[in-house]
Amino acid sequence: MDKRFYSFFNLTEDQAIAILDTPQDQIGEDDSRYIAASHLVNFNSERSIAALMRAIHHTDPEMENRIVRRKAVETLGRLRATVALPVIRECLSDPDCYMIENAVWAIGEIGTEDPEILQEIMLLLDRSEQTYRVIIQTLAKLDYKPAIAKIKPFTTDESLPISSAAITALCRLNRDFSQMDQIVTLLQNRNVIARRLSIQDLIDANYYAAIPDISRCPVSLVFRLRGIGMLSEAGIQEGAIAFVDIQPYLEKSLIDHPSSLSLVHSYDTLPDLSFLIHELYETDFGRCYTAIKTILENYAESAPEALFNTYEQEAKNDYGAHFHVMKLFPWLRHAPAYNLLIEALHNKQPQFQKSRAAAAIALAEIGDPRAIPEIKSCLTAQIWDLKYASLLALEKFGDRSGYELLANDDDLLIREKRNS
C-alpha cells in the first residue's frame, strides 16, 4: 500500500489524541477532530487505537461528529486493529448508511471468520438505501460462500459498479472466472465510474489476463498503473505470469500517448482549439485523451502558444490539466517547454505527483541532454512510477547507469526492469 500521503499534518500522536478527545462543541477553530482521526493512521499503538474507539462511542448526532466517527472506523481498518473489531461490529446497525459502509470495509481490512459477523454483513444486502458494492466486495474478500445466493440478484443491477462487483464476487466465491469478460468489457464503457471501478474488480479477482485491456482503458493513468502494477506484482510472485508478458503494457501506459488507448469519445465535427484546451480540465480523462489526440492531429502548430497560455492562467493549479499539458509539449516537439518540464519533474506537491513521471518522459522526448542529471536524481524517489519513468527516459538518452542505483530496490517491478 502506498502510504506516502498519509501524513500531511504536523501533529504528534499526543496532539492528535488530545484533539480527537475534545468535544466537538469545544474544538478550536484551528483544530479538526477529522484531521486528528485521519492522522492517527501513522501511529499503530494501543493509545491511538483506544482514542479512535472512544471517538466511535461518542454518538453526538451533529454532522461534524458523524463524519469524525466514520473516519475513526476507516482509520482502525487501515491499522488492521483486531482489538477494535467488536466496536466496529456495533456500527453495522448504525442509522448512518455511510458509517455502515465504512464499518463493512474496515472489517474486510481487519479480517474475520466469525460466522455471526459475516452473516450480519450479508444481511445488509436486504437493507434499502445502502452501499451494496462495498458489502459485496467484502463478502467476497472474506470468502463467505453462504452469501452467494444473496449476491446473485445484484449481477443484473442497473448500477454498473454494483453489478460489476457482484459478478466479480461470484467468480471469486465459486472459483469460476469464466464470466470475468463481462468486467473486461466495462473498461470500454462510456461511464467513467464504471471504467474506473471495473479495474478494481479485476484487481480483486487477480484477473491477470486483463492487463493488456487495462493498459488501453481511457481513464487516468493513476487507475491504469494501479491495476497493472498490482496485478503484475501478484501474478509474478505467484508464478502465473512473467515480467516480459506485462512489460510492454506497463511501459506504454507510462508513456501515456492517446494512440495506445481505445478511446470511447469522439467528435462529430472538428472542435476549435479553445474547446479542446478546455477539455483538458475534464475529470473524465477519456475526454481529455480524445482532445489530446485531436490537438496532435489538427493543431500542432498553434497548440504550443495556447498551452503556455492555459498553463499560466489555470493549468499550473489544476493537477489534471497540468499533467496533460506536460505530456503535450514534447509530442508537439516544443523545446522551449524545457524549463517548465524541469520544474514539473521536481514538483513535490502531492497533487502534482503524476506530472513528475510525465515530465521525465517528456524531457527525454525533447532530447535536451541537460535533463540527464535532473532525471537521474529522481531514481532515489520513493515513487515507483517516477523511478520507472526515469529509467525509460534515461534509456532514450542512451544512459543505462541508473540501473546500478536500483540494484536492491524495494519495488518488484523496478527490480524486474533492471534485470530485463
UniProtKB/Swiss-Prot annotation:
It comes from the Bacteria. One of its GO terms (molecular function) is oxidoreductase activity. InterPro entries: ARM-like, ARM-type_fold, PBS_lyase_HEAT. The keyword Repressor does not apply. GO terms for cellular component: phycobilisome. Keywords: Antenna complex, Phycobilisome. Pfam families: HEAT_2 (PF13646). Transmembrane segments: none annotated. SUPFAM superfamilies: ARM repeat (SSF48371). This is Uncharacterized phycocyanin operon protein Y. It comes from Pseudanabaena tenuis (strain PCC 7409). The lineage of its organism: Bacteria, Bacillati, Cyanobacteriota, Cyanophyceae, Pseudanabaenales.
